[in-house]
């Protein structure tokens, strides 16, 4: 795995640390998140209401998620530098892998249309209609 200090910093800053699992603001329930936005434990089991996590464990879970996302990104064979890779990792952590696959971001990045990719990422992050 590459060093992903920027992605970790971005995720930690914007997600914030939550010791106790919180409900999704859109559904009012599932998926629950805790730590720095983790929805799943490293073994794949989901975070549930009432679960708690320490900051240390939350960082371990985040590093595991980043490793998984990075491994999946490798399979797409995108020609991206480390800054774009970290931005994509942060984005994917925020919206999820499935949503990323169905977004236009991959096509824009693959076509080197980076401004369009950023615009699309902003729509997913800040536009409630995508959630």
Where are these regions (language model features)?
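A structure-centric signal for secondary-structure junctions around beta-strands
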Residues: 28-31, 85
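Long, amphipathic alpha-helical surface segments
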Residues: 1-29, 38-47, 53-71, 78, ...
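Amphipathic alpha-helical interaction segments
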Residues: 87-90
């Amino acid at each position: 795995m590459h060093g992903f200090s920027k992605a970790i910093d971005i995720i930690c800053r914007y997600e914030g640390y939550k010791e106790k699992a919180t409900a999704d603001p859109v559904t009012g329930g599932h998926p629950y998140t805790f730590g720095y936005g983790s929805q799943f434990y490293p073994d794949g089991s989901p975070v549930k209401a009432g679960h708690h996590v320490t900051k240390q464990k939350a960082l371990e879970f985040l590093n595991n998620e980043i490793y998984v996302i990075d491994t999946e990104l490798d399979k797409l064979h995108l020609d991206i530098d480390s800054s774009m890779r970290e931005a994509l990792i942060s984005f994917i952590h925020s919206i999820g892998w499935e949503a990323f696959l169905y977004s236009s971001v991959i096509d824009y990045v693959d076509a080197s249309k980076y401004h369009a990719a950023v615009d699309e990422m902003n729509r997913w992050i800040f536009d409630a209609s995508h959630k």
